[in-house]
């Protein structure tokens, strides 16, 4: 176990910036829905703004970005100045604090959210930030754990601020698939999203870290009572997938829902026949949980 005084400044601020080709891929998918306004909750030096500048943009697209570090926010503003097609505003402030106010008032809703939220252990966050993270969970009536990570409340708040039918595209830690502290997020995605896709790479995308990361693409339900098609997971090797249309992966990947997405998502990596075999073993009269016999 590492102590906070032994961690690097980069790790303590969770700043692992997105490669441009991945940002372009995510932006391409969110723009496919013809958004009028777009949110980035942790814009860093503005790499997603750069990605937007390489795309054909909807007329009058509004971009709202947040970055807590003034030096990085200034870089993002410089990128905005070079993209006159965007009606952009970059705020140097805490996104979670702003998001809590918006969730209370219900004033701001977005057609799309993109980004790469900070990867920071809860224990390394300032006390004020810890309280804001816990508040996000409480506002969404989700169980909270102090084992969480900053990226989890960032994603929760971002989905909450999406309009019905809105899209979210983010790079997040691969631990979303299995860790207990992401269970509330997995549950929330399964409840409020009509479809969501994990693009899970074999490679490490960020230099200088062993942290695995993946792409999450999610589409919010138009109505809370709508059916959810659930989760799809695509394993990729290398970056060849980036030359394809993200909409093809999102629309054509086989999905699972129901009890399979209630817990850990590792079952989604199995074939349908493998899942059916495991389910039949669970229900077999001669198979028992360990806590039932010990």
Can you say where each PLM-predicted feature lies in the sequence?
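N-terminal, positively charged/glycine-rich alpha-helical extensions of SAM-dependent methyltransferases
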Residues: 1-7
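Signature of N6-adenine DNA methyltransferases within the class I
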Residues: 11-12, 16-25, 42-52, 57-61, ...
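Short, conserved SAM-binding/catalytic segment
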Residues: 76-87
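Conserved class I S-adenosyl-L-methionine
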Residues: 35-42
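Conserved SAM-binding strand-loop segment of SAM-dependent methyltransferases
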Residues: 85-95
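Glycine-rich helix-loop-beta junction characteristic of Rossmann-like nucleotide cofactor-binding loops
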Residues: 28-33
């Amino acid at each position: 176990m590492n102590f906070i005084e032994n961690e690097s400044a980069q790790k303590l601020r969770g700043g692992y910036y997105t490669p441009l080709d991945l940002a372009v891929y995510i932006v391409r998918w969110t723009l496919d829905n013809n958004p009028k306004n777009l949110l980035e909750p942790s814009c860093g030096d503005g790499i997603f703004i750069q990605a937007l500048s390489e795309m054909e943009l909807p007329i009058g697209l509004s971009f709202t970005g947040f970055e807590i570090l003034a030096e990085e926010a200034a870089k993002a503003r410089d990128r905005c100045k070079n993209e006159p097609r965007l009606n952009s505003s970059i705020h140097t402030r805490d996104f979670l604090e702003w998001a809590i106010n918006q969730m209370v008032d219900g004033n701001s809703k977005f057609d799309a959210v993109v980004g790469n939220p900070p990867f920071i252990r809860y224990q390394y966050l300032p006390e004020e930030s810890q309280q804001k993270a816990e508040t996000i969970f409480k506002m969404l009536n989700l169980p909270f754990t102090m084992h969480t990570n900053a990226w989890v409340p960032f994603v929760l708040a971002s989905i909450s601020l999406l309009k019905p039918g809105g899209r979210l595209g983010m790079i997040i830690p691969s631990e979303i698939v299995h860790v207990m502290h992401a269970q509330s997020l997995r549950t929330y995605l399964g409840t409020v999203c009509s479809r969501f896709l994990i693009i899970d790479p074999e490679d490490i995308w960020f230099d200088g870290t062993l942290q695995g990361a993946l792409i999450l693409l999610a589409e919010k339900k138009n109505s809370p009572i709508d059916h959810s098609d659930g989760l799809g997971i695509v394993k990729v090797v290398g970056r060849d997938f980036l030359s394809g249309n993200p909409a093809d992966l999102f629309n054509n990947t086989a999905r699972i829902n129901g009890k399979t997405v209630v817990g850990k998502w590792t079952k989604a990596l199995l074939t349908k026949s493998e899942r059916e075999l495991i389910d039949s073993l669970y229900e077999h009269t001669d198979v028992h949980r360990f806590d039932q016999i010990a």
